[in-house]
Regions:
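Residue-level signal for mature regions of secreted extracellular proteins and peptides
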Residues: 9-10, 50
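Metzincin-family zinc-dependent endopeptidase catalytic domain
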Residues: 71-181
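Metalloprotease/metallohydrolase-associated module, dominated by Zn2+-dependent proteases
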Residues: 20-32, 47-48, 124-159, 175-217
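Sec-dependent signal peptide recognition
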Residues: 2-9
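C-terminal motif of bacterial Sec signal peptides marking the signal peptidase cleavage site
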Residues: 12-15
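Generic detector of well-ordered alpha-helical segments enriched in charged/polar residues
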Residues: 35-43, 78, 106, 200-208
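N-terminal hydrophobic targeting signals that begin at the initiator methionine
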Residues: 1-2, 17
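Disordered inhibitory propeptide/activation segment of secreted metzincin zinc metalloprotease zymogens
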Residues: 17-71, 133-140
Length: 217
């Protein structure tokens, strides 16, 4: 019931101009923390001029893994996908496909230069970023394609695993960073976090709850 309550409040606040203290539903401190962090992380993107509204995948996410073969990172991706799938309740599905033509999301393991050859629009970012993601969305604010990379030359395996989790999770539509919580996967400063905090999990649950729609601010 907690998440349904939070969803109702978010929907209320997004469509109502009255004062927040008129809300009848009582929220505890953690509920308010989740809502505040959700608004900070889920509205808009870190770069560009896109409006600060909710966006998420409205169809299945079909992942193709390219670049250099890396069994350790492949296994880590499987683990991350399993974790995400356990948190979503709106029929969102993630699968890894072996044919890039069937995919709508490309994960590249290798060097930044090789990634930039495949995706030239990312060329200006790879020198200063060991991990990177890009997303596109349609007129309904549903994410519909994207790509990311993990630089396996400038990172050790722990760092590479962290970047894979961070960039892939942000590609769900939780696309902004924050300096608020040190252990969060969305922490803006460099960390080597390899797991989600309870708060991180709740953000995924909220965005991929059946009551959460795109286009909310």
């Amino acid at each position: 019931m907690r998440f349904l309550k939070i969803i109702v409040v978010i929907l209320f606040l997004s469509s109502c101009s009255t004062e927040e203290d008129e809300i009848i539903l009582k929220l505890d401190e953690y509920d308010l923390e989740v809502i505040s962090y959700f608004k900070e992380i889920a509205l808009g993107f870190e770069f560009g001029s896109s409006s600060k509204i909710t966006r998420k995948w409205c169809s299945d996410l079909k992942v193709y893994i390219g670049g250099e073969s890396n069994s350790i990172l492949n296994e880590e991706l499987d683990k991350i996908i399993t974790e995400i799938s356990s948190l979503t309740t709106d029929n969102f599905n993630i699968e890894v496909v072996s044919d890039s033509s069937l995919s709508n999301y490309y994960i590249f393991f290798g060097s930044g230069d090789d990634y930039a050859e495949l995706f030239p629009n990312s060329a200006s970012y790879v020198q200063s970023n060991w991990g990177l993601f890009s997303l596109w969305y349609n007129s309904s604010n549903c994410l519909n394609r994207g790509h990311m990379y993990v630089d396996t030359y400038r990172t050790n395996i722990t760092q590479a695993k962290h970047l894979l989790r961070e960039e892939f999770t942000q590609s769900l539509g939780l696309a902004r960073d924050s300096d608020k919580y040190l252990n969060s996967i969305f922490q803006s400063s460099w960390t080597e976090t390899l797991s989600y905090t309870d708060l991180d999990k709740d953000l995924i649950r909220l965005l991929y709850h059946p009551k959460m729609s795109t286009g909310l601010d």
